[in-house]
Amino acid sequence: MAKFELYAEVDVSISGHQYPIIICRNGLIDPDLINRFITSKQVLIVTNRTVAPLYLGHLQSVLPSKQCDVVILEDGEEHKNQRSLFTIYDSLIQNKHHRDTSIIALGGGVIGDMAGFAASTYQRGVRFIQLPTTLLAQVDASVGGKTAINHPAGKNMIGSFYQPQAVIIDLNTLKTLPEREFRAGIAEMIKYALLVGGSFFERIQEVLQQGLTVHSPELPLLIAECCQVKAKIVEQDERESGLRALLNLGHTFAHALETYTDYKKWLHGEAVAIGLYCAAVLSEKKGLLDKPIVDQVEKMLIHAGLPHKIPNSIDLIQLRELMSLDKKIKNNCLRFVMIKKPGACYIDDSVTEDCLHNTLINVVEGEQK
């Protein structure tokens, strides 16, 4: 059996609940590691049709003494809905899972969101372990305890805050990740670079210029740093009453774009990439961000192989209406994360309709800034 290899461990402490984020190789097939967090006799593994053929058997093999049930869902954001959620509930109930059961999320952000929400609500809460298999889930979605399903009216409209027992990031799972999915995860890394600034921003710029791949030696520690950044923010503000809202940089635009296209045109990270560029242009329009930094953001997204412009087929008026459904609205004001410079971001609820519309026009494909 391949030997367990530890790169880093990030400790998270939220509201008295402590858990580790373990960045490693061969963690998925290490019985000591998995059973350290699965103390229950019953386990439900939630995964999807893409991941199951690759890793489900490996995970089941380290849980031979457990009642190990499995739910295999359709893959994709468009399936993060009530029907999929009730498929999880149905399996838990039909297989007589008790309150001391454990749910394992084996997959990307969609699986983590749904399995986590099921764990937070089944019998008022059961143990939950994240095994993220995409870069986006490893650096962002699996960290911080946000769980949700989508509603036809908007993304993540129904959800909860619920922390896992552990997050086990086995980097070997990235070897089978499609190139497009890997690049989508880089968008969240660029987001962290903009939030943190300083040497981290410069380092992300540098590795993107060189060409970041799944084989890049810098990748394990970059993932660990992203997890550390998010963990520190979430520890201070679990329920997004202030500081944590900064993690939504670019997401007001991104969620509206995803809803507009019924989650079928872009991966979440690709929509975030466009949202980051929109946020940079909006910050420039407000006189906050220097044009050279906007150009740097654009180059980072291009180096990452990510989209950054809004297709000219999108109805901008309808897009703005979808933004008005955003969960981040407070006192009827749409709130955007603005960038003064990398490492200096803040929440702004004074963006006018004209300023927002001018920003959207400027980021449409074929338009000049």
Swiss-Prot record:
The UniProt record lists the keyword Transport: no
Residues annotated as binding Zn(2+): 188, 251, 268
Principal location: cytoplasm
Catalytic activity of the protein: 7-phospho-2-dehydro-3-deoxy-D-arabino-heptonate = 3-dehydroquinate + phosphate
Cofactor mode of binding and number, as noted: Binds 1 divalent metal cation per subunit. Can use either Co(2+) or Zn(2+).
Signal peptide: none
Gene Ontology molecular functions: 3-dehydroquinate synthase activity; metal ion binding; nucleotide binding
Cofactor dependency: Co(2+); Zn(2+); NAD(+)
Enzyme Commission numbers on file: 4.2.3.4
InterPro entries: Dehydroquinate_synthase, DHQ_synth_AroB, DHQ_synth_fam, DHQS/DOIS_N, DHQS_C
Pathway given in the UniProt record: Metabolic intermediate biosynthesis; chorismate biosynthesis; chorismate from D-erythrose 4-phosphate and phosphoenolpyruvate: step 2/7
Keyword tags: Amino-acid biosynthesis, Aromatic amino acid biosynthesis, Cobalt, Cytoplasm, Lyase, Metal-binding, NAD, Nucleotide-binding, Zinc
GO cellular component, one term: cytoplasm
Metal-binding found in the keyword field: yes
Subcellular location: Cytoplasm
BP terms from Gene Ontology: amino acid biosynthetic process; aromatic amino acid family biosynthetic process; chorismate biosynthetic process
Protein residues bound to NAD(+): 75-80, 109-113, 133-134, 146, 155, 173-176
Family membership: Belongs to the sugar phosphate cyclases superfamily. Dehydroquinate synthase family.
Function: Catalyzes the conversion of 3-deoxy-D-arabino-heptulosonate 7-phosphate (DAHP) to dehydroquinate (DHQ).
Record's protein name: 3-dehydroquinate synthase
Source species: Legionella pneumophila (strain Paris)
Gene (UniProt): aroB
